């Protein structure tokens, strides 16, 4: 369920603030969103995979914390990111 390096590099290139940026909240949130969508598809097939379900909940919580941080620090980047990732604003 890990992202392959090509898909990860594509996401990093799309959301990076500058060349080589992998640690900004935007990139981290985009990578987490991709992992969450992959795990969601996995759990649609394997409904009783409770270990993956717990991992999914952990990833969702981490993304939620990063989104609240980004909303607090840079609201314009936050609103742009949630529109690009099709996430709901709370």
UniProtKB/Swiss-Prot annotation:
Coiled coil: none
Gene Ontology terms for molecular function: rRNA binding; structural constituent of ribosome
Entry GO CC: cytosolic small ribosomal subunit
Keywords, alphabetical: Ribonucleoprotein, Ribosomal protein, RNA-binding, rRNA-binding
Biological processes annotated in GO: translation
SUPFAM superfamilies (UniProt xref): S15/NS1 RNA-binding domain (SSF47060)
The keyword Chaperone belongs to this UniProt entry's keyword annotation: no
The protein's role, per its UniProt record: One of the primary rRNA binding proteins, it binds directly to 16S rRNA where it helps nucleate assembly of the platform of the 30S subunit by binding and bridging several RNA helices of the 16S rRNA. Forms an intersubunit bridge (bridge B4) with the 23S rRNA of the 50S subunit in the ribosome.
Subunit structure: Part of the 30S ribosomal subunit. Forms a bridge to the 50S subunit in the 70S ribosome, contacting the 23S rRNA.
Family: Belongs to the universal ribosomal protein uS15 family.
This protein's name: Small ribosomal subunit protein uS15
């Amino acid at each position: 369920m890990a992202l392959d390096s090509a898909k990860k590099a594509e996401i990093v290139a799309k959301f990076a603030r500058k060349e080589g940026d992998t640690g900004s909240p935007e990139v981290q949130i985009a990578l987490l969103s991709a992992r969450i969508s992959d795990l969601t598809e996995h759990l649609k097939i394997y409904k009783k995979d409770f270990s993956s379900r717990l991992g999914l909940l952990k990833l969702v919580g981490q993304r939620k914390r990063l989104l609240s941080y980004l909303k607090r620090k840079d609201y314009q980047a936050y609103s742009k990111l949630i529109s690009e990732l099709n996430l709901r604003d709370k």
